[in-house]
Amino acid sequence: MDIIPAIDLLGGRCVRLYQGDYNQAEVFDTDPVGMARRWLSQGATRLHLVDLDGAKTGEPVNQAAMAAIVQDLAIPVQVGGGVRSRQRVVELLDLGVDRVILGTVAIEQPQLVEALCAEFPGRILIGIDARDGKVATRGWLETSTVQATDLARTVEKAGAAGIIYTDIHRDGTLQGPNLEALRQLASEVNLPIIASGGVSSIADLLNLFVLSTSGVTGVIIGKALYSGDITLTDAIRAVGQGRWQDVPPDLGFSTFA
């Protein structure tokens, strides 16, 4: 399972929101590049960047910070937040971003999403942010009437590379992921699903790992890493590539006679 640290940018700073509430932004660091290097040093193989300002305005706001991270690190970076045009997708890919996350446009401009998936195969992820099962848009400030499962089926047909599923009520709360919603989503589509929101412990990660055979291939961790409830190293050892259970014990002798 891919363990992906999150860096959410608001006003150039690394923050975490509580249930998507911008008024409850908690600042954890003022040096995004330094934070990215920290996660890299602890074993990160991919980063998840979100321009929270951009998610609200629909325009790039934290471009300088994101560019600095992408250019400084030699690991893949996925970026979302206010990406609502082909031009913006091209700008991010030209910058060196590995995958671009589309959210609001998946609801408002499905034809654009289909066209982008066709033009950039394997590079477009869809962020499905759900509030009580319905998809939220525009930085989670609005809630549509579209069910998350319905959107998932639509973007699968459009050719998306995968889905990032966030339960807004769990995000930033450390209350554990919504396993039932993830299980249901995974049963509806044949796409890689990355879980996001609520992870607070190694136990939560192990519960998610059980769903890996159903299509939940990764997890984005934010608040728990910043608060110290989980270390990235321990998370990777528990459910990441080369996890403890995948490494045979060193018995001090060969088992082959």
Swiss-Prot record:
Pathway the protein contributes to: Amino-acid biosynthesis; L-histidine biosynthesis; L-histidine from 5-phospho-alpha-D-ribose 1-diphosphate: step 4/9
Enzyme Commission number(s) from the entry: 5.3.1.16
Principal location: cytoplasm
Amino-acid biosynthesis is among the record's keywords: yes
Domain of life: Bacteria
Residue numbers annotated as active site: D8 (proton acceptor), D129 (proton donor)
HAMAP family linked: HisA
Membership in a protein family: Belongs to the HisA/HisF family.
Designated name of the protein: 1-(5-phosphoribosyl)-5-[(5-phosphoribosylamino)methylideneamino] imidazole-4-carboxamide isomerase
The gene coding this protein: hisA
